[in-house]
Amino acid sequence: MRPNVLLVVLDTARADAFEPYGALAGTTPTVAQMASASNGFVHRAMYSTACWTLPAHASLFTGRLPRSAGFAKGTPPVFKHAMDAYPVDTLPDALRRAGYDTAGLSANPWISEATGFDRGFERFQMLETDRNKEMDGKRRRDRAAWLLDALRARADDGAVAIEHLLAEWLRARTKQPFFWFVNLMECHSPYLPPKPYSPAGPIGRVRAARDAARHCTLDALWRVGAGGWDIDDGALQRMRAMYDGAIRQLDAWLARVFEHLDEAHVLEDTVVIVTSDHGENFGEDHKFGHTFSLDDRLLHVPFITRGPVSIDLHAVASLADVPGALARTLGVPSGAFDDVDAPRGVAVAQLDAVGDEGDERVDAAVERWGLPESAKKFFFTSYACATDGAIKLVRRRGYEEVFVLATDPLEQAPIRMDETVDARFADELAPLRRALDAAAASEAAPIDDDADDADHDGDAGAAEVSALEKQMRLLGYL
């Protein structure tokens, strides 16, 4: 019988927050034990295909780069339309056809029925988090609610509820193999882990919550991305400390899930995959959050597995490689993932413009922030990058630049392309250029934003959209 699969996405978790990728010993003991187990594996050069949740998950489920299937940009209804209209099997589709029990649990409002990511799952549930439940009425619309939560230090972002559901499913399961997907939001802003994982007392937590309330709104993140840096070192340190506490919380969660698998006598028959959709910046090169950048703090994600089979991936891989590799490993028909645009041995990522030139919203925002006209380029520029883990090639607006990651890990010293540079890096650049050319050639027409108003069969209902909006407010997006 085929093995079970538990795919856990730790939203916003950067690779270097975990011991196998350089974090201090004792930071993530469960992940460290996964990596060192006789049936464990660490992929040291796994990259996301985007710097934010929706396109990254689209790649993880379809095996394609975001633009290739129309997942480049758009609102939740646009993504739902793209997922519903996707012409071949997604990973959950393929595993369901192969006889797997497919189920998903998400604490992330972006990964929900409202955005189409329930496709292929027999059961899918987006959970209302403890933090959401504790903040009712007007408070739910006010980021001051984060201050209240900071004092209480008891609410989580859905991990406990998801753990309980997994335990229930394990008790009720049949002999049918399962593919269960989980998305956890503990280390996403506002970075407020509950006791005992919080590194600060009540006063420190309130200060960290105030920092998040100021700097984690969409308006603030875009302002910083456009060059309006205004975050002091103390705020960065407080938020990073809370983020690291959330990482420890997730590591402890994984330990309990392993216990549940063991108690259900399926641990040795289950492939557990721990990864992320993207990372997070905390002031490196004056970057914060996960906007307007394809730097390695955002793209380099953890990928650790433990189980009876090993997933065959190239030494350098991206989330778009995972569906095909997993399907082949499980002996599941993988035709939907074999003839894809994602290059092998090179990781490509894409970032799309927020708006088009002349967008009045962008004009008003740049004027409100007091930034120069040149700041608008951050909103209007789409670009892509390719890396072999040592060299990163960035292509934007008709020009290329190179980063040598060994000597420039923060990517602060771009090397503009000329004949000398081209000759110096000729061997390294050739496969990266081929990858970017192939990705560009495979781009699908983007879904029109008018899809927001279209009457698509199976569109999420008012309840799902309301739940999405409610949780997005708590994350600072609205």
Please report, for each region that a protein language model flagged, where it lies by residue:
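Catalytic domains that recognize anionic headgroups
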Residues: 1-478
